[in-house]
């Protein structure tokens, strides 16, 4: 029983480490996207944002994603593109 608990704790620690790594990757990408948007002229920036939003609207995920997850993705993209971090 102790071995099982120890194995579960090791797996949990690995999952936590993976989650931290993904968080760091997402934050790094946010910084890069924000910097790129800030260095673009306004018209080019707006055109890029519209292209991204249209592409997202046209995507049909496979396998299908539930509506809540799709809405979260759209909200996050809107926040990132329309209101980039300071």
UniProtKB/Swiss-Prot annotation:
A single GO BP = cellular response to starvation
The entry's localization annotation reads: Cytoplasm
**GO CC annotations?**
cytoplasm
- Looking at the record's lineage, which domain of life comes first? Bacteria
Q: Which Pfam families match?
A: Anti-adapt_IraP (PF10796)
Q: Which UniProt keywords apply?
A: Coiled coil, Cytoplasm, Stress response
Chief localisation class: cytoplasm
Matches recorded under InterPro entries: SigmaS_Anti-adapt_IraP
The record lists the membrane-crossing segments as none
Point out the coiled-coil segments of this chain.
Answer: 1-38
The similarity comment for this entry is: Belongs to the IraP family.
Question: Which proteins does it associate with, and in what oligomeric form?
Answer: Interacts with RssB.
Role noted for this protein: Inhibits RpoS proteolysis by regulating RssB activity, thereby increasing the stability of the sigma stress factor RpoS especially during phosphate starvation, but also in stationary phase and during nitrogen starvation. Its effect on RpoS stability is due to its interaction with RssB, which probably blocks the interaction of RssB with RpoS, and the consequent delivery of the RssB-RpoS complex to the ClpXP protein degradation pathway.
* Protein's name according to its UniProt entry: Anti-adapter protein IraP
